[in-house]
Amino acid sequence: LPDTIINVYCDESCHLENDGFRSMVLGAVYCNADKTKDLSRKFRDLKRKHGLAPEFETKWTKISPAKQSFYSDLIDLFANEADLRFRGVLIPDKSVLDHRIFDQSHDDWYYKMYYLMLRQLLLPNSSYHIYLDIKDTRGADKTRQLHTVLCNDIRDFDCSVVRRVQQVRSHESELLQIADLLIGAIAYESRNLTGSRAKVAVIDRIKARFGHTAISRTSSVTSRKFNLLVWRPKEDGQ
């Protein structure tokens, strides 16, 4: 039997070393590749239902009172679709990092965090197509390096498990936009922000569906639908 192909859509928030933000979030929404078209169609149908154009790009930063019900419904769509899952890593405080101690650059650490996020998803009986929304100019280098790191770390030397790591722009992928929404909520909560009632309402919907601490504490290992790791550096190595 052919193995299962999983599409993984990754996004990142505040990942640069000196960007002025304390926290950083990486997140991935993933599903079987053969479900992607149907799920994307449901996403576009939801946009139409709320009077939005199908090509409207969903983003955490675009949440407004007028669109709050759409974004809350989108959380419900994600929650109700058994084929869609989320895995995230929250780094609450980048300022505690001291890469010199561990003889690594910020980029080395960045790939390590991506591996930490993705390794829980990578099963030997499946193959993975990983799509990254990389927002800086070094995207091509980062995708190549991440592919190498992932394959080496799981001993996938012929790249039969991690078949593909490539860039995609978020406006080209509905599922990537869901990742943006979820990591935006995690980042907002981690900074204790409350200025936008609409954003707080969307966060409340996430908590109602996945638990009050879903976006602020490490999930149990058995949480497969919505899984978050809150990462802090250890004394013996990052």
Language-model region placement:
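Phosphate-ester processing/binding pockets and catalytic centers
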Residues: 1-238
